[in-house]
Amino acid sequence: FVIDNITEKILIANYFDDSVHSVLEDLFSNNVYPIVYAYIDNVEKFSFVRKMCTEGMNMFLESRKGDVRTNEVNSLSELKEGNNFYITCIDEPKKLMPLYDKYKDKYHCVYQTDIYTNEQWLEIMPLEASKSNAIKQLQSMLNCEKLIVFGDGKNDIDMFQMADKSYAVANAHNDLKQFATEVILSNDEDGVARWLEANYKQ
């Protein structure tokens, strides 16, 4: 999603089609119970069944405490409600890797170890939903000539590959660093903010 910060108008959106329901059923049958992001009655929410949450999911939810998008539901069927656009699975690699292999060619999938919690994640999105695709559309809308990006995870790789310059924070995933123009200070050291302060007038 790309949203105008002032008007809160959605500028770019990519939703799953109804085939996502069969994906969710497949996850459930493999004892994987995700957090599902959707627009429900025109309001963004992320839904989950608390009793099905893994330790990693509970850690994530704790980090989002107070988030108005939080939507705890009581049944798996409720995870299918609304216009789904993003699925997050946080579970054991032996459960997630086969699902990544199964869906990586049909959807935009990111399989990675979270650099902050060391938990294994599988993210599933519509095929068109990537940072690089969103940036291409924004570049066209804004008539941008130069692209500088910052990142820390494997889901930033496609964005790094298309940028004029790309900067990975020191605590970034090692797979991302190999695509970086330069490695800057870590998130804990406010690396991005410090880089912008030093370079934004160039």
PLM feature segments, named:
Residues 135, 146-181, 185:
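Acidic, Mg2+-coordinating phosphoryl-transfer loop and its flanking beta/alpha structural elements
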Residues 25, 136, 193-197:
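Predominant activation on well-ordered alpha-helical scaffold segments within soluble catalytic domains
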Residues 26-27, 101-102, 175:
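Alpha-helical scaffold elements within enzyme catalytic domains, especially in hydrolases
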Residues 22, 37-150, 154, 159:
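Conserved acidic, metal-coordinating active-site core of Asp-based
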Residues 174, 185-202:
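Glycine-rich phosphate-binding/hydrolytic loop that grips phosphoryl groups
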Residues 1-42, 139-148:
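Cytosolic catalytic headpiece
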Residues 12-14, 52-56, 127, 186-187, ...:
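Short, hinge-like loop/turn segments at secondary-structure boundaries
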Residues 3-6, 10, 118-121, 176:
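A short acidic, helix-capping loop that chelates divalent metal ions and anchors anionic groups
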